[in-house]
Amino acid sequence: MNKLLSLATYKQNMKSKLLLLTSLLALPVCAQDDIKDQFNPVMTAVVSQSIAGDARAAAMGDLGAATDPDVNSQAWNPAKYPFTISRSALAINYTPWLRQLTNDIALLNAVGYYRIGDYQAVSASLRYFSLGEVITEAGDMTIKPYEMAVDVAYSRMLSETFSAGVALRYIYSDLSGHYDDNVKPGSAFAADISAYNQSYVFIGQRECQLGLGINISNIGSKISYGDDYSYFIPTNLRLGASLMVPINEYNRISFSADVNKLLVPSMPLKHEGEEEADYQERLKTDYYDVSSISGIFKSFGDSERGFKGELEEIQWSVGAEYCYNDKFFLRAGYHHESEMQGNRKYYTVGAGFRMNVLNVDAGYTIATEPSNPLDQTMRVSLSFELDALKDMFGY
């Protein structure tokens, strides 16, 4: 929650470089005496990389590591593309973000893939996150901060049931709109490593599709905004499973679950009685100066709350999808995050309709707390199957 509210703070004021950075890198301060009880969520830069961009995945609780492959697999598990039925497709996704707080923050992304033969595929996506307009304190200038990322991926079947993929990504973040010379645009390079297994199992007399997936995303450099500090990007480990059960010739239902953990170290908290200068020095040495790769390994055992704290860093999602005749879809899900890591808990619902060429999907978020800025978030996705488009025009 603190991550989301920090965006609203950014919209309200822009007094200094610190405010620019903390709008996306919130540093929570709590008054508890026991350091183990302090609110200390894992913080990252470029939070747009952690937002579910497509309506189908969002309607199922923000999951997609092992769901039936589709055009939007790039963000969830690129290794799924060789198992797609259509040879090629394009998608455009739009998400108005934090509409409970403001009306001009939005995420837009475009995705496409092409399957080469029967065993491999290439894919790419472009993600643009607009932070709206910010009027400077002097009122003499309006800036438009934004984040963007472009990535390409290659995936290949290594057996009849197993595939692997790798993606390369460039991330760019401009928080100041070139207004403050002391705050520079930041950039980072990252890679994803993913794998997917699709097999069939019998449950009674029904042959069901079982999907298992893993995606380690955003393994790469840290990002800096022109000062002496560098910030972690959201390196993430995602594991998923999905079971598709045919009911009869026209109906089927899928059940899916994902767990994910940020592979980013927790920020050290100030100890009772510790001098501020000593704390800042320790913070720089034990956090800001830690490399991204070292941070991955450190993230598994650095919580001030011990093993319990490490478990609290795990988010999980469950979702279901009902399909009628490959034309109509109904979806629902739930996403859970610990209170100590942000308390993002919400239900999701959605629907989809597939025509010969065009697929239309929508997703809607219902937060467990009405005050949650994610409440009533709507996502819309349009996708086009290029094979069907070629057939329509006789190519």
Model-derived regions: residue spans:
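N-terminal secretory signal peptides that target proteins for export/translocation
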Residues: 1-14
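N-terminal signal peptide c-region/cleavage motif recognized by signal peptidases
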Residues: 26-28
